[in-house]
Amino acid sequence: CDKTEQTVYCLERATGEIKFSVLTPFENPSGLAFHKNSETGEEVLYVAYAGEELYIRDDPNSEDPFQLTKRDRTFIHPLSFHYNEAECYALSNGFLIEMSYVEELSPLDEVEIDNLEWRIALPSETHRQKVRKITPVGMPFTEEIVEGERVAVFKFDRLMKGERRIFGWKALLEVRSIKYQLSPQDVEKIPKLSPEFEAKYLVDNDNLAMDTEIVRSAAVASIGTETNILRQLLSIRNFVYDQLSYGIRPHIDTPDIVLRRGIGSCGEYVGLLLALARLNRIACRTIGRYKCPAFADRKGVPLEPDFNHVWLEFYIPGFGWVPMESNPDDIQDRGPYPLRFFMGLAWYHVEIGKGIRFQSLSSGGVPLKKEDVSVGTLAINHVRFTILEELM
């Protein structure tokens, strides 16, 4: 196993070649052992984890008694996994989680809107994520299918001044970690992108500043002489990590501004990655929207994420969409950078509305412009997760 990569490797006994790898549900894996169940005869792989955790220390002798500090943490946990060799991916420890997304109407300005339709994307069905059940919260909704994704539509005959209510959805989800098992040799000979994909995923349709000199120059520099799609993506990712440091911003700036500033949020990392990849004719799209707080041992406790989160997927012709994280692997200045979330996602990612807008507003069937009225000026969102059980 590899502590930094948060990964366990399965090797070919005779040659030592990697057959497949899986992500661990916790950070800092440091030891492995198989144990045979005496009753069933089944062998279970256990992983030892050794690291540090933050906690609030109560110091009665201090003027400020509650202090944030670290302590050692060591424990053992079984690792379950499944390798789908035919489709080139491996799944590991899964969890049944309940996620609720609720909007609380609280307009900054008094507005009235007739025939308002408020659309909120619903969780997706993927290799690593299965939707067991979705129920409405606060008021009923109808469902639409947009580009293969489920969308909840909340309808208001008239949104009145001073109106207050909550509405949203609650989902019961099975989520697992996934790691795609592709090498550059596997994608040496791939077909060309279809014209439909070129028109949709190689264009600047999200303020990516792809026509600016600084971004176009970065696109050339980012891949060097690489021609293989995986090596190109990895080179682009490492280039972006070299150029940026992570920092929360109140709003998302365009990639040209982000490059000059050298600091970006997850959304700004994604914007720059999208721009450079698309300029190098690699189809890609934004994916998100939330991460369950990564406390897999806190079952039955409501958990609240501090922020939303986005990452991206790139398309390999002849294979399909493959995930790539935005900033979490940018862990040290100038690298080297781990590969744990290159073609992989941890169990705590929740994929919602892949390739479509997360939320949108319309009145009488006409989309409302963000400059006139936006979701952020109408409501406050509330997101909660509860880990119900571990899936074996």
Residue ranges and their predicted role:
Residues E12-G16, P60:
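Short loop/turn segments that connect beta-strands within beta-propeller blades
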Residues E268-P367:
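Hydrophobic/aromatic-rich core segments of domains that either
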Residues V146-G148, K161-R260:
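Acidic low-complexity segments
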Residues E63-K179:
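Intrinsically disordered, low-complexity N-terminal segments that are enriched in acidic
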Residues C1-T4, L45-A50:
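Conserved beta-strand positions in repeat-built beta-propeller and related beta-rich domains
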Residues S21-F26:
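Surface loop/turn motifs at the tips and blade-to-blade linkers of beta-strand repeat domains
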Residues Q6-V8, E53-Y55:
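Structural signal for beta-propeller blades
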